[in-house]
């Protein structure tokens, strides 16, 4: 039987390669940080989710080592059998405090948090209204649920209102959105979303994976940015981006929602508990963020500097308040060539093109970190300018 399947798989893989969509894993020979080692050469990393520069922070490493000496390496159990230590509850409390919510539940990843949130809470009597650019984990989570599904164009409040009107016959309605959308870096208009939710009696859920630690006056996410505390019912997020970059996800929000997820959310019930080392380091992250806003301030300074310099150089960058800067090139082939040349110049970036982004919307996504210094940013900007001149690139939109 496998001979027949192998033929099918080989054909599928060949088609993926022919379409230019085959993903290669690029090996890093150093710790994850602003300057990394690839093939024995130091390059500057501008494609990591390491927004606060904490992935290799000495305080996190020391905290992980210390907690492993006290609590061991792994848990070898799910949470409800013998996989919950006191430190797991401490981290859940720290996350609740950070987001100003009532309770929190930890998962192995945010993919699991989003995959396990809908099915326990909603049935065919209910409606889930989702932004068209929401993360794949939200899409998959919704698919596991029998609720009626609606989708509105990215951040389009007119379409969202129409969906809410159509869903009025359903028992419960929930609006689901990313806080920051990963390809454009744009921020969901949470104030307007909450206004519509209140007008049409709907719940609100936001995935803070790319926004927590990044947006808002002190980096506390979209509810801080738009002052929607108390108006959002469910937050999901990750420990794998701004909060240290290791592993782990969470859902935080109303107490009764979290209580039911502990009873019925399958990724929580049937997955191993997060390892003590990750818990210890994550607790140190939230301690650091409570002590000072310096990392967030540095991130904002870096983002503004990069955007201003790139715009002055003539590049077309999507407007955003996040740490994701989409440098628009529009042409798919050009984005691939450009990214490859940038890597030759010692700048690690990635080109994105259809079908990951819409046709004729190819771009290079640059992710800024508090771990970058001015010299790193200047080198990246200089490389963009140099490669652009080499390729004869018109960096503004062809229709402008």
PLM regions: where:
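Conserved PLP-anchoring active-site segment centered on the Schiff-base-forming lysine
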Residues: 117-136
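Conserved PLP-binding catalytic core of the aspartate aminotransferase-like
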Residues: 297-306, 311-346, 356, 360-361, ...
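PLP-dependent enzyme catalytic core of the Aspartate aminotransferase-like
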Residues: 58, 62-66, 70, 93, ...
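Short loop-beta-helix segment that forms the pyridoxal 5′-phosphate
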Residues: 78-84, 92-116
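N-terminal "arm"/small-domain region of PLP-dependent enzymes with the aminotransferase-like
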Residues: 6-73, 202
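Active-site phosphate-binding strand-loop segment of PLP-dependent enzymes
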Residues: 150, 154-206
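Active-site PLP attachment segment
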Residues: 218, 224-260
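PLP-dependent aminotransferase class I/II
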Residues: 243-310, 315-318
